[in-house]
Amino acid sequence: MTPPHARTWSRRGRYPVVRVRGRSRRRISIAALACYKPGERPRLIYRPRFHLPWKGARKSFAWTDYRDLAVRAHLQLGAPIVLVWDNLNTHRSAGMRQYAADHDWLTIFQLPSHAPDLNPVEGIWSLLRRGALANVAFTDPDHLTRTLRRALSQIQHRPDLIDGCLTETGLTITPNLTLIQKASVPVNWPPVRA
């Protein structure tokens, strides 16, 4: 664990020493999807990943982890998914693009580069940093994991917070009327003139 101190002091001419017990090299990553559908309550689906402390082990999510998160969301929601992702290189990987092309229930759009203010999940992370993670000195990685799960569970049960994260971006969810209109047009329309 890294020390919870942002700053420290010492006498002039002395080097400050901060003693920390239980230093750990374990790493935890979390990916989340904020799910919105007009007329229904929003949902938050997340997946933690506990990284192995071995040399050469991957220190972040792989595209297969994001694929598994999308599959989990598809199974929970029981409907096709339109993912709107930031431009993380793992989101744009060839494996993820191929997976989306092979499955008709998955459509992926990319947010513009350097636009975290358009991503509702950034609002979720902000809620965590300002709430449950603020001014806490975690004793070990398990303490951090328990705190994160509890805080994310509380956010999952507050749809107004998840809605607020979308509202903060300035984006709105509207059904695609052109798709609805195309579906209502007869198959042999327009009539062929001889």
Regions found by a protein language model. Give the residues of each.
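Acidic, metal-coordinating catalytic cores used for nucleic-acid/nucleotide bond scission
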Residues: 83-97, 113-118
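Short glycine-/polar-rich loops that comprise or flank the Walker A/P-loop
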Residues: 26-28, 79, 104-107
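Extended, low-complexity cationic-aromatic segments
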Residues: 1-68, 173, 179-192
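C-terminal anion-handling pockets and recognition modules
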Residues: 122-194
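Short, surface-exposed basic-aromatic patches at helix termini and helix-loop junctions that form
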Residues: 98-104
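RNase H-like polynucleotidyl transferase catalytic core
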Residues: 15-22, 104-120
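Short, basic/hydrophobic alpha-helical segments
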Residues: 63-82
